[in-house]
């Protein structure tokens, strides 16, 4: 009897949200420490200089969460020292105009300030006046700044950064963290904007590797899922798929984990199984096309059908030994009145399917499926091959 108890803890879904900032950031703690060290003068010598940092890296490399964690720590340090520091984080992709960008900044820093009836430049000066009147300092992250400049222009960025320079003999109230996929957008800035914008420090974030993704997923599983609902094998499965298909994107990995958990709940399972991950991947980022299967030769299709059936029967398995798949293959060949190939040729067929990106093979030559549910693959192949005898 399948239980209807959720695999998630009561607040588990929040712990898998992209906006969530976990207590620990595996494999990004060093970057947080370096950022805090670089930005520490904001607190130790407030107003002496406007600090500007650029963080670059592909999607899912931890740029946003690292900036937010840095902001949390900087606010805490300032509070403990009796200083007023506000951290604000604006995703520029969600702002389609200069006004919308400034409005989002003000909403986080001084929500009581009226914004209607004013232009973006007037609002920037109102923000500056607010910071001066309240003796506050601002650490502002402009996330996806490259997208904003490409689609909206550089004017407001110039005005923001110029604001800290044009008023002399007063504390520099605004400090910046800029986040971008890469630093290429700097090359398209006008000389006047670049002179104001140019960061003093740059941090380049590499993609996560498989071991690092395992650590990240393991932490999220502890926070989000009930005990024994996600096995180490499932964590390894998602980490490996993320490296193979998601290019080390931690967001992709967490998205797969969340989707697989929701599928487990939908089907009434007490734990996440490989089929849930395969279905989640199929929905999140489908990899296999019908034509990829249609063009296979006859025995490749028969072997693939044998693997799909075996995995559908063994829902808890990520991989199956080649010997077990060979037994199923022999049964399938008998069903379709075909002479099975020998073991050497069977290994060659499996290697060909792997090279085509249709199956995966681990270091022990166990076979598995990625990107599609075993049951879906089984039905498709049975329709393609027709009914056996």
Regions found by a protein language model. Name each.
Residues 53, 77-94:
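Conserved catalytic segments around the Walker B and adjacent sensor/switch elements
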